[in-house]
Amino acid sequence: MSSLERMLGILDAFSEAAPVWTVDALGETFGLSRSTAYRYVKDLCKAGLLAPVGGGGYSLGPRIIELDRQIRNVDPLLTAARDTLRDLLPRVGEGILFICGPRGDAVLSVFLMENPNTLDISYSRGRPMPLFRGSASVVILAHLPEGRLRRLYREHAAVIAKAGLGNDWIAFRNALRAIRARPYLTGRAQLDPGVFAISAPVFDADGNILASLTLAMPEHRADKEDVDSLADLVREGAARITAAVASRAPLTPVAAGSMR
């Protein structure tokens, strides 16, 4: 692991449960000398990623708020999702439409829109969720590269077995292949009681998994309505987002001299 990776890894320590850290506590947690921990914290503060809060404590810094605003306004996935979900929402009835993307060995809810509903779902924006449970997560998992799936199985075999995805590598691989072959994935009360979910994959311009689009709705709707018709709407939305993301060509780098 490079020194940059170790320094940025410090940010993972900050959470709702532990929003403030001292240099000494960070050094102890990450196995760093005090001088190294101090240097990392100093550099992160300089970049605006951390900020002092008094008493020797540090919290996440204002640069993160700035980056969040930029992501909300111009991120290709969120821009495409906003336009698509706005059109889709009146057609799906009671429930919540949300987008999740992979982050490390978890998934992160990054955007949602909702019709009036009584649901209480775990996928609130910015909250990491398990990779092996819930259709929004598993549909992403199924499309990850095989090399990454092998590593995930080595490191999380017990969790994978508990989630019903296979008791050995072959069974795990075959389960994901079967999921990958389907146009959508459903889940009933897998994370939240009373919630039925329909998820479809979203891909980037190169055909790699980028995110999932999910409709979460009251479980009773799945017992009374045509799930396939609702799934067609989710698939339509996922395809539209995929196409919109692919249409946004990367910017050509600007030569340093031309920026003066």
Q: For the regions a protein language model found, what residue spans apply to each?
A:
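Amphipathic alpha-helical effector-binding/dimerization core
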Residues: 60-155
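Short, structured helix-loop boundary elements
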Residues: 1-4, 61, 74, 78, ...
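Short, basic/aromatic recognition patches
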Residues: 81-88, 153-199, 244
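N-terminal helix-turn-helix
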Residues: 1-74, 78-79, 239-247
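Sensor-regulatory modules in signal-transduction proteins
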Residues: 202-205
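An N-terminal domain-start capping segment
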Residues: 1-22, 86-109, 236-259
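Juxtadomain coupling helices with adjacent low-complexity linkers
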Residues: 169-171, 182, 193-194, 211-260
